[in-house]
Each structure stands twice: as C-alpha cells, then as structure tokens.
Amino acid sequence: MSKSENLYSAARELIPGGVNSPVRAFTGVGGTPLFIEKADGAYLYDVDGKAYIDYVGSWGPMVLGHNHPAIRNAVIEAAERGLSFGAPTEMEVKMAELVTNLVPTMDMVRMVNSGTEATMSAIRLARGFTGRDKIIKFEGCYHGHADCLLVKAGSGALTLGQPNSPGVPADFAKHTLTCTYNDLASVRAAFEQYPQEIACIIVEPVAGNMNCVPPLPEFLPGLRALCDEFGALLIIDEVMTGFRVALAGAQDYYGVVPDLTCLGKIIGGGMPVGAFGGRRDVMDALAPTGPVYQAGTLSGNPIAMAAGFACLNEVAQPGIHETLDELTTRLAEGLLEAAEEANIPLVVNHVGGMFGIFFTDAESVTCYQDVMACDVERFKRFFHLMLEEGVYLAPSAFEAGFMSVAHSMDDINNTIDAARRVFAKL
C-alpha cells in the first residue's frame, strides 16, 4: 500500500469519511485521495514523493501559487507578535481599507473566518435590513453549508425549497426559493409570487460549484433590475471569483453593482478568512451599531489579516490578471484542440483564472441542466489518467479549476500534452 492509502485507512477510523471536507475524499471520482506533504509554486507533492501540476489551488485561494514568500514572511512576522488577541488591531483597519479600496461597491466590510460565515451573515443582514424572510438562490450554486442554503428546488418551478441534507428543518428551507441560473424569467416569476416577502437574491457571478458556468450577458444586470423593482437586496457571492476574475471581482468584470458582497479564499492568502460588506446604510444595521447580530472569536485574527493583506497587495500588482487570463486561455484552447484531435466531445468554459471541463456533445454549458447532462463517467476516467500523468485536477466533475500566476507556459503545455495522451485512451 502507498503511504496515502495507509493514511486514508487510519483517517477513516478517526475522521468521518477520512476527510475534513467531503470533496477531498474522492467520492466524486473514486479511488484514494492523495495526502499532501508540501506545496510550492504551481506544484503539490504527496506523501509518496510524487509531484503534480496543481489546478485546485486549495480550492481557489492560491492565485499567487503555493508558499508565496511575501505571504509566508508576513505570517511569520505576525506570529512573532502573538497569535490572537480578541481585541482590535491596526492590521484590521489596514485590511478593511485595502479591501474597500479594491472593491468600490463595499463602503464597509466585516471580517469573518470562512465563506460560509460570510454568506450566512450577509443573508441575515439582508433579512434584518428589509424585514423580509424569503431569499432566492440558484440551482447548482453553492454558498456554504448554512441551513438556509442547503436547499434544492421543489418539484415545480415556483414550489418552496426542500432540504437537501438531513438536519435542515423543512421550516427553514421553505423560505429559500430556488431559481434557474441564467434564467431571468424564473426569477421574475418568484418575485411575482412573493412580491413583498423576498429579502435578497444571492448569486455566484460565475457559478463555480457546478464546475464553471459564466453568466449570460443579460443575467446579472437583470437580477439588479429585479431587486430594484421589488425592493430586495442583491448579494454577490465572490468567495470564489473575488480578486480572481478581476481585481475588483466579477461584479466589476460584468459591470453590476451589488448591495452586499461576500468574499473568501484569496482574501486570506491561504489562511481561513471570509468577509462581507457593501452599502453603508445596510452595514450600519449590523451589531454593534445596529440590531442584526454577528460575532466571531477569531474574526480579524492578526495572523490571517497579515496573510490576506500581503496576498491582496501582491494580487493588486499590474499584470497579474492579464497573466491569469493568458494562461487560462492557453490551457482551454489547448485542451479543446487535443480533444478534437481525439474526436472527444468537450466544452471548456473559462473566465479570468477559472476554468471548467465538460465532456458533452452540447455546443455550450450555461445552466445546471446542461451540467447534469455531461458525461461524468468519462470525467472520472479522465481525472485518474491525468493524475497518473502528474496533473492534479479537482476530484469532481462539478468543481471549477483554478489557475495561478505561478504556473508557467511550460506547465500549461505539459498539461495539454498529458491531456492529448489521455484523450487517446478514453
């Protein structure tokens, strides 16, 4: 047995499923998950000594690559002054100033410890600010594991949501309306059925949890218009897209102004950080200045703030996003060319430093139904063959891939060459 197999066997006796987040268990592709020893730049190194070109990037945060010296040094320096104080620090102020400067729609920001905390708190704030209970989310979009968000669509277009996890009371789920991503008609229908009851829409501007599905040109502006028409708030969940699709996020890339924004992943530079913020009048409703409660023992933790501050300063340097786009575009084009040579039907979506690989005969993938029609079994074979080639992709057909500026053009070309060999075997 390999060392990864031995560790996984031991882990399953001690940790549910052997992992601390379900997708890591390789249940979406089968087999034994890799246990990682270290990472540097664009590469992961497993406990058995094998290196992989990494397109998971810790599920998004590693836009600069692994073990970036500016972030590592910032963490070391901060740790020498203490790990946590439970009191305000200067770095919290500097971090808030940096974030609000980089994302102009955020007049104020509150730091938390995860993307789930950010979305959960933003929804509570929207409900408290509007005095309404219902929310709209989209089928196939993921916003963390808060009870109100673990909800799937009912049996009809306008039925109330149903829990998609045991432990979520139906009474919670009934306040969550699930609409179709990239379909404004389904959203209007929900508002027309509940015109005075919907507090907010929460949306991934690029749906990254049904692989990578960009918005149609009219979709995000249409959501903004519907929120204005019916008095609801628009929450854009940029946990995945923030500072990756563009410096000011996908909202800037697509030209839409939200009321609230949720951030995570890159904002922590690899440390556990989330944030939410937006309009000053809405944020003023948050405790201690307002009645909507939110708190956190480790929120604004000095180590995490130092890592995030260092990361964002690096990400804000000229040329970063142009490089991300160039690398991702080359990868997407190369994969499509290699698939065509092997007569493999393939769609590759990409925006900025995100991409998605779909084995499908369709010309495009624009919604959850399109994603579900893809050939998952072929993806599983593709994943394992690429792993044998030393390329680490997300171990699920429903998760986006992530580029970093640490990837070289040689890494990209080697990945395309590996895919060409793999396509010949599919």
Curated annotation (Swiss-Prot):
Positions carrying N6-(pyridoxal phosphate)lysine: 265
Cofactors (names): pyridoxal 5'-phosphate
GO molecular function, one term: transaminase activity
Pathway: Porphyrin-containing compound metabolism; protoporphyrin-IX biosynthesis; 5-aminolevulinate from L-glutamyl-tRNA(Glu): step 2/2
Pfam families for the chain: Aminotran_3
Subcellular location, record wording: Cytoplasm
GO cellular component terms attached to this protein's record: cytoplasm
Catalytic activity, EC: 5.4.3.8
Chief location: cytoplasm
Any single GO BP term: protoporphyrinogen IX biosynthetic process
Catalytic activity: (S)-4-amino-5-oxopentanoate = 5-aminolevulinate
Gene3D superfamilies associated with the record: Aspartate Aminotransferase, domain 1 (3.90.1150.10), Type I PLP-dependent aspartate aminotransferase-like (Major domain) (3.40.640.10)
Entry keyword set: Cytoplasm, Isomerase, Porphyrin biosynthesis, Pyridoxal phosphate
Entry annotated with the keyword Isomerase: yes
Protein family according to the UniProt entry: Belongs to the class-III pyridoxal-phosphate-dependent aminotransferase family. HemL subfamily.
Quaternary structure note: Homodimer.
Record HAMAP family: HemL_aminotrans_3
Protein's recorded name: Glutamate-1-semialdehyde 2,1-aminomutase
Organism: Salmonella schwarzengrund (strain CVM19633)
